[in-house]
Amino acid sequence: MIRSLAGAFAFGTVLPVRASAGVGRGALTALPFVGLALGALAAAVVWAGGWAFAAGSPLPGVLAVAVLLLATRGLHIDGFCDTVDGLGCYGPPERALAVMRDGSAGPFGVAAVVVVIAVQALTFAELSVLAVVTAVVAGRVAVVAACRRSVPAAAGSTLGAAVAGSQPRWVVAGWIVALAALAVFACPRPWQGPLAVLVAIGCSLALVAHCVRRFGGITGDVLGAAVEVTTTLAALGLAIG
């Protein structure tokens, strides 16, 4: 378990954690714990910003998103950008994967990144501390779900090959149940939180399924997209009302 946590934090954060092995099944299973730590960090920034800035200011949310980007090396948002560019191009899967590996950001990807960062920043500023934690954890639970059994890796993807199909269904179900239980306390209405995170996870699963059809399987970029889309939609759902 300690090795799995070390691998998860080495993969999902900038912390100089030594991992005895690369990213694999154990590290992916433990990834929601990384989300819990990152969510607590973002929530602390929002809480402190609430004291520092005027009521209703979006700056606490902006700073929280900035801290998350720094703490994750921008890994997930970069993957989201590449995935959007890949989905936005024409041609066979090989062409889409080549676009994703190119390293440069296209206009479609840049526009999508701006929207996602803006929505996260604005919603985080409106959420309770626990709701911020819940949204960030939801993004990491989505990665576990994306790597469930039967999901293939795209051709040539090193990370995809290491983690695709690695998560048993009971692990996926367990994390989703735990996330829904946490979300009960994230909003004044006890049903809103679970509904918000379940819808967000469902949308992420639909995105991953589309990527599997388009690319022939998942890649590390697709997992980054799952993180960002789920976090954004969960935060949006938790902020309603």
UniProtKB/Swiss-Prot annotation:
It is a multi-pass membrane protein. Disulfide bonds: none annotated. The keyword Nuclease does not apply. The chain crosses the membrane at residues 33-53, 55-75, 105-125, 127-147, 168-188, 192-212, 220-240. It catalyses: alpha-ribazole + adenosylcob(III)inamide-GDP = adenosylcob(III)alamin + GMP + H(+); alpha-ribazole 5'-phosphate + adenosylcob(III)inamide-GDP = adenosylcob(III)alamin 5'-phosphate + GMP + H(+). It holds the Pfam family CobS. Joins adenosylcobinamide-GDP and alpha-ribazole to generate adenosylcobalamin (Ado-cobalamin). Also synthesizes adenosylcobalamin 5'-phosphate from adenosylcobinamide-GDP and alpha-ribazole 5'-phosphate. HAMAP family: CobS. This is Adenosylcobinamide-GDP ribazoletransferase. It comes from Mycolicibacterium smegmatis (strain ATCC 700084 / mc(2)155).
